[in-house]
Amino acid sequence: PSVSRSAKELKAYHFLENEILHLDSDFSDFPTNVDQLAVWMQKKNKTQCLHYKEYLERRENGSAREFFGTTSKAYEFLYKVAPTKRVDGAWLYSFTQYWNDPAFRDFIQIYVEELGLGSSQSNHVKLFNKLLLSLGLHQFSMNLPDEYYHQSAIQLALAYAPSDFIPEIAGFNFGYEQLPLHLLITNYELKELGIDSKYFNLHITIDNFDNGHAQLA
């Protein structure tokens, strides 16, 4: 049976309240002053790029792959992250109801780009599913323990979160759209193993600091 939007919002509200209650934020160096965000983001981006440069130097000097020692390890990674990749960008869905408010324009732009800007072939979820299908991994995630679905459950809850959570959704988006070191290494090593890394390379391109999602966020 169809579930009403209000019922989804109520479930999302209680779920997210519980998640926030158990959130450990002590490790975060996130600035408390919004005026410091640009500097913080630039510093983080430079740090990631420096670490990636060091990684490339290690590899050029004969170091082994650091993420995927074998093809099977790469396959295992792909189907284990599938639950999260299959809801890529979902957290911004709740902002589409504010489509006529200029304050939400950049968020909605990110969302429609995640959907492929009207092209199903560019839809991020479809790209990832296509990758899994090409490798015969499309059904493996069905047997994963519940904890592998935790992150995707959070993103889907944000997708239906009521307006109370606008700051949390914006903050989640800001953090998620930063370019992480693990994405750069994953893209490099998958290509090295002959695995199509288009999905990951796409996120490196669109999440860039200068004019991509990281800047829009």
What role is predicted for each listed range?
Residues P1-A217:
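Non-heme di-metal
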